């Protein structure tokens, strides 16, 4: 949406060159704030699957963005977990990465998971995580795929997906940083996607922080 502003007179002591430089600086400040990479919102409204339907058929791609302004517009209008009802998920992943175990970026990875029993807590943790991701606040940002907010009847979950599950040192560093980001004091557990695929999850998770 274009903005219309009244033109301000240039001070008599300013040369046209100085005034032009000032105008250019102001225009740059008002322009969109670009992110280091593109990100994509996804959503998954889960209903009773049809017989023979493949997993992930309800997963839909939402919007891809690359500016701070676009993120806030999408978050405020649509992608807030408390707006979800029933069994549904919101995902924020790097553009080009699908929130599926089968995606090459996720295939050998895993996830840190936290539980939330209150929608307000989930909203806050989701927002803080999204801002940390798009703001590249993690030292191991190349290892992160994205985050998933899962709303369920009994309790909600937030999961941070990463690429290389076998690299314990990196995953532990990411887990510790994430706890700081969302101000989480309870134990956090990391599980391998391979364990979930085999339906034999490691008891208590592979790593904890």
Swiss-Prot record:
It is found in: Cytoplasm; Nucleus. Residues 1-29 are annotated as: Disordered. Keywords: Cytoplasm, Disulfide bond, Initiation factor, Nucleus, Protein biosynthesis, RNA-binding, Translation regulation. Component of the protein complex eIF4F, which is involved in the recognition of the mRNA cap, ATP-dependent unwinding of 5'-terminal secondary structure and recruitment of mRNA to the ribosome. Recognizes and binds the 7-methylguanosine-containing mRNA cap during an early step in the initiation of protein synthesis and facilitates ribosome binding by inducing the unwinding of the mRNAs secondary structures. It comes from Triticum aestivum (Wheat). GO terms for biological process: regulation of translation; translational initiation. The keyword 4Fe-4S does not apply. Residues 9-29 have a biased composition (Low complexity). GO terms for cellular component: eukaryotic translation initiation factor 4F complex; nucleus. It comes from the Eukaryota. InterPro entries: TIF_eIF4e-like (IPR023398), TIF_eIF_4E (IPR001040), TIF_eIF_4E_CS (IPR019770). Disulfide bonds join 106-145. GO terms for molecular function: RNA 7-methylguanosine cap binding; translation initiation factor activity. MRNA binds at residues 51-56, 83, 101-102, 152-157, 197-200. Belongs to the eukaryotic initiation factor 4E family. According to the redox status, the Cys-106-Cys-145 disulfide bridge may have a role in regulating protein function by affecting its ability to bind capped mRNA. The lineage of its organism: Eukaryota, Viridiplantae, Streptophyta, Embryophyta, Tracheophyta. SUPFAM superfamilies: eIF4e-like. This is Eukaryotic translation initiation factor isoform 4E-2. EIF4F is a multi-subunit complex, the composition of which varies with external and internal environmental conditions. It is composed of at least EIF4A, EIF4E and EIF4G. EIF4E is also known to interact with other partners. In higher plants two isoforms of EIF4F have been identified, named isoform EIF4F and isoform EIF(iso)4F. Isoform EIF4F has subunits p220 and p26, whereas isoform EIF(iso)4F has subunits p82 and p28.
């Amino acid at each position: 949406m274009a903005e219309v502003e009244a033109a301000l007179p240039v001070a008599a002591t300013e040369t046209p060159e100085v005034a032009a430089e000032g105008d250019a600086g102001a225009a740059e400040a008002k322009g969109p704030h670009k992110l280091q990479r593109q990100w994509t919102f996804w959503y998954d409204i889960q209903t009773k699957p049809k017989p023979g339907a493949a997993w992930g058929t309800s997963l839909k791609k939402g919007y891809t963005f690359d500016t701070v302004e676009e993120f806030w517009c999408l978050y405020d209008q649509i992608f807030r977990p408390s707006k979800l009802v029933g069994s549904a998920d919101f995902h924020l992943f790097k553009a080009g990465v699908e929130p599926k175990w089968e995606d090459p970026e996720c295939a050998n990875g895993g996830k840190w998971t936290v539980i939330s029993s209150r929608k307000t807590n989930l909203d806050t943790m989701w927002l803080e995580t999204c801002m940390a991701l798009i703001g590249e606040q993690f030292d191991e940002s190349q290892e992160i795929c994205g985050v998933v907010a899962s709303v369920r009847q009994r309790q909600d979950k937030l999961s941070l997906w990463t690429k290389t599950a076998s690299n314990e040192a990196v995953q532990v560093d990411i887990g510790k940083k994430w706890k700081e980001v969302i101000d989480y004091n309870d134990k956090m557990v990391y599980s391998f996607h391979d364990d979930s695929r085999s339906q034999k999850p490691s008891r208590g998770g592979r790593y904890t922080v």
